[in-house]
Swiss-Prot record:
Highest taxon listed in the record's lineage: Eukaryota
Name by which UniProt lists this protein: Small ribosomal subunit protein eS26
Any single biological process term in GO: cytoplasmic translation
Disulfide bonding pattern of the chain: none
Compositional bias per record (Basic and acidic residues), positions renumbered to this chain: 87-97
UniProt keyword Cytoplasm present: yes
Location(s), subcellular: Cytoplasm, Cytosol; Cytoplasm; Rough endoplasmic reticulum
UniProt GO molecular function: mRNA binding; structural constituent of ribosome
Pfam families cross-referenced by the UniProt entry: Ribosomal_S26e
Residues covered by region (Disordered): 85-117
Organism: Caenorhabditis elegans
Subunit structure: Component of the 40S small ribosomal subunit.
């Protein structure tokens, strides 16, 4: 039978069995190596309230803690929520990670502090 992907959609090599995890979105059981993993780092408070909390804080340079959360999606939920997308047969051969968005350099960001011309 023909196969669609070289790794059969999994990251399991030379292992007979891997543990199952539950999908963050729907609760479906999915093998840990097949699940789509996404690591999310967020501020505890939203951006609008950061300045208010900084003004009200007793400490001058208090760094607000962040929330670190690892999300596990089954394939159906990852496609539905657009974490991953369908790719053509030629594009499936490309094993490079997708380009990262939102990570611009400090110099390229408009309004960033820096040397004045």
């Amino acid at each position: 039978m023909t196969f669609k992907r070289r790794n059969h959609g999994r990251n399991k090599k030379n292992r007979g069995h891997v543990a199952f995890i539950r999908c963050t979105n729907c609760g479906r059981c999915c093998p840990k190596d097949k699940a789509i993993k996404k690591f999310v780092v967020r501020n505890i408070v939203e951006a609008a309230a950061v300045r208010d909390i900084g003004d009200a804080s007793a400490y001058t340079q208090y760094a607000l803690p962040k929330l670190y959360h690892k999300l596990h999606y089954c394939i159906a939920c990852a496609i539905h929520s657009k974490v991953v997308r369908n790719r053509s047969r030629e594009a499936r051969r490309d094993r490079n990670p997708p380009p990262r968005f939102g990570q611009r350099a400090a110099a390229a960001r408009p309004g960033a502090p820096g040397p004045r011309p």
